[in-house]
Amino acid sequence: MELTSEEYEELRGLLGTPDIGNADTLKKAFLKACKVHHPDKGGNEEAMKRLLYLYNKAKIAASATTSQVWYFLIIGYISLKNKNIYLPKIFWLRFQNMAPHSGNSGGKNSIKALMSKICIVMRN
């Protein structure tokens, strides 16, 4: 359940940001936009409903991607440790494309470190 390009543009407009960025900037922009669009603060009720819908959809898509990345990391780590599990090259290409480029720094560094180990082993 990912955002379409139209929904992405609409969310950017409602948030008032040029780019959504990572989860932290998305949340900050969302909270700021809630103050603008909330009906109790003089905002439009329909705009607020749409903002909530698009924000939740973006969060679900982001968490699904994060779950997929961790799944691939775990499978890759098992294959790295056992050295007896062969995974096709397409798996690794897909995995590399899914690696997050932004987000909270806690998981980002560990993902990058493990991914680089897995990719080095697969190249050899």
UniProtKB/Swiss-Prot annotation:
Coiled coil: none annotated. Its main location: host cell. GO terms for cellular component: host cell cytoplasm; host cell nucleus. Residues 10-96 form the J domain. Keywords: Activator, Early protein, Host cytoplasm, Host nucleus, Host-virus interaction, Oncogene, Phosphoprotein, Transcription, Transcription regulation. It is found in: Host cytoplasm; Host nucleus. It comes from the Viruses. Promotes efficient viral genome replication by accelerating both G1 and S phase progression of the cell cycle. The common region of ST and LT proteins comprises the J domain. This domain is essential for multiple viral activities, including virion assembly, viral DNA replication, transformation and transcriptional activation. This domain is also required for cyclin A-transactivating activity of ST. This is Small t antigen. It comes from Bovine polyomavirus (BPyV).
